[in-house]
């Protein structure tokens, strides 16, 4: 897809991978609708518009989608489902509230956003949905059962919907990033950021690479890890 002039929705745009993705898309000529709970700091561009949206609530997603089409036009070409969060802890000490918060954001929110854009993408017979999962969607991790469960769900959802919409000219790509330098690790005891991590810009570059492939060329899954693991102190 030639991204010049295309309209892209990026969820979780406030920081990290979402912010980096919005910036790279703008550099490629796209018009970007950034959805998030707070406006990203320092992102000013005549082709960027922020729409407040908490993806945990379907009504908020529907309102953001309606507002996006009203402000940027009916055709939506790209959806990057990036909004997500992770909470760690052993299962027997994990709060039900935290469990539901993760599923509401990582799984239900992704479903709401995808459901919103699909009718328009089907009508135009063109679109690309990129779902940001995690390495945690490919293997279990100690004290991360809830987070892993949400990302395995994203994996299954992506693989299924790809088969549903491929004949409508719509691509679905699922990314599985490894350790990335964001604030994800701030709330996880005993887990610290380290110098070997990938940067949000690395993930954003991979997203754009997948988006810019020729029409009949489709990257279904992308698994990314740092070349070198964390050095042991």
Report each predicted region and the residues it spans.
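Conserved glycine-rich cofactor-binding loop
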Residues: 7, 14-15
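Conserved glycine-rich Rossmann-like NAD(P)H-binding loop of the short-chain dehydrogenase/reductase
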Residues: 28-43
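C-terminal helical subdomain
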Residues: 168-170, 174-175, 190-230
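The beta1-alpha1 cofactor-binding region of Rossmann-like NAD(H)/NADP(H)-dependent oxidoreductases
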Residues: 53-63, 96
């Amino acid at each position: 897809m030639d991204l010049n002039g295309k309209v892209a929705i990026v969820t979780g745009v406030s920081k990290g991978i979402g912010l980096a993705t919005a910036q790279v898309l703008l550099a490629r000529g796209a018009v970007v609708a950034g959805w998030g709970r707070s406006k990203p700091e320092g992102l000013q561009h005549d082709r960027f518009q922020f729409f407040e949206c908490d993806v945990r609530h379907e009504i908020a997603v529907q309102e953001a989608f309606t507002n996006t089409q009203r402000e940027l036009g009916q055709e939506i070409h790209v959806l990057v489902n990036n909004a997500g969060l992770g909470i760690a802890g052993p299962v027997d000490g994990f709060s039900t509230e935290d469990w539901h918060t993760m599923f509401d954001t990582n799984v239900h929110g992704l479903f709401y956003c995808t459901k919103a854009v699909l009718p328009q993408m089907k009508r135009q017979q063109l679109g690309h949905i990129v779902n940001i999962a995690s390495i945690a969607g490919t293997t279990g991790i100690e004290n991360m059962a809830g987070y892993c469960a949400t990302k395995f769900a994203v994996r299954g959802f992506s693989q299924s919907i790809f088969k549903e919409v491929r004949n409508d000219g719509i691509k679905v790509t699922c990314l599985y990033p490894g350790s990335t330098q964001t604030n994800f690790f701030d709330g996880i005891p005993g887990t610290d950021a380290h110098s070997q991590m990938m940067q949000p810009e690395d993930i954003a570059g991979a997203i754009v690479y997948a988006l810019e492939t020729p029409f009949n060329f489709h990257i279904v899954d992308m698994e990314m890890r740092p070349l070198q693991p964390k050095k042991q102190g």
